[in-house]
Amino acid sequence: QGEAAAQSFLALGTTVDELTEGTIPNALLYRHISSDNITPSSGTQNDLWNRLQNYYARSIEVLNVANELPDNNTKATNLSKAYGGYIGNLHAGYALQLLAECFSTTPAAEGGSIRLNNALVSHESLFTMAQNHFNKALEFVQMQAIKDASGFNYNAAVRQINTYKLRLAMHQQRYSDAATLVALAINDSEQVEVIYNNDGSDNPLYAAIGPNARDVQVTANLEAARSTTAEQNALPLKHASVDKKNPNRYNIYASALSRKGALVIADAADIHFIKAELIVRGVLSGDALVEVNKVITKYNASDAETAMPSLERIATLRRIYLALRGERTADIRRGLEQGSAATKWQQRKTKWLPLPEQELENLP
């Protein structure tokens, strides 16, 4: 999941104003995306495509293994079946969501499809499939075998699944559904994350846009957009030299990332900004100003907002506080961002990555 999510966040961030190509890149994917010059024959998108397809395939394998376990009604088997159904469906749903958000047969416009299991599947259908997988994950995690398992935080797992459902609802502009889900998502002490301090591997975001960033870097535009101490604390950035003879050649990197730190999919900041947006949209009761300040004051109390936030202001805040998670692209696609970034987006030829050339051959 971590590699698939990280590579998706990087590609999506490069389609908007979060990321751009590195100063002296080895790989050309981010140059092709940021220059709006990527085609099916480019080939640079193939690794991400394969990564996401593999992520989905491995998730389905987990489901198949769970389904093949004997129906002997033992405690161990019941737990394995339930846990496999929960994990397999959760990740299958997220893999489909990432595929739909990253790739399309119509890169310049909505309404595209991707190739899945040798069939063309529309984005709309992929999102429906993802939603169904999340719902099935919820069914499995509510089985008695999991509730009875020692050491397993059943309630946290339920909140985790509902957070995935919530984010999908927001991306699809199903705001009434999101208003129901937001109370069921993670709390202030939780986050949906991929942990890297156990198996020896490194956080892939750190590897890509940490101090050794080469192929991709944070945009100067995003660096300059951090106008308060709170924003600079929330998104600390530094410059790393790439040419000892020329100090003006550097990459801008995310200095808060650590080699063994967690890769965050969603956290409390997501939830509070979603609540604020839903309140402003009139589908949730509450105080939008309180919600945004719960995020801001965590980083610097004196930077608390004093005016009731508009949707435009929420988009600006989300750009900083939820940076590098793929949310910026989703916000522009769903029309939350209405500024110059949205205008530039409309002018792009590549709003989704094109499918690799071989996937377009002999289409069904």
Predicted regions and their residues:
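Short acidic-aromatic linear motifs embedded in glycine-rich loops, typified by GG[WY][YF]DAGD(H)
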Residues: Q1-Y94, L98, C102, T106-S125, ...
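Aromatic-residue-lined binding/catalytic grooves and analogous aromatic/hydrophobic interfacial grooves
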Residues: Q131-A137, V141, R159-V194
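Internal helical hairpin/lid segments
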Residues: K260-R281, V290
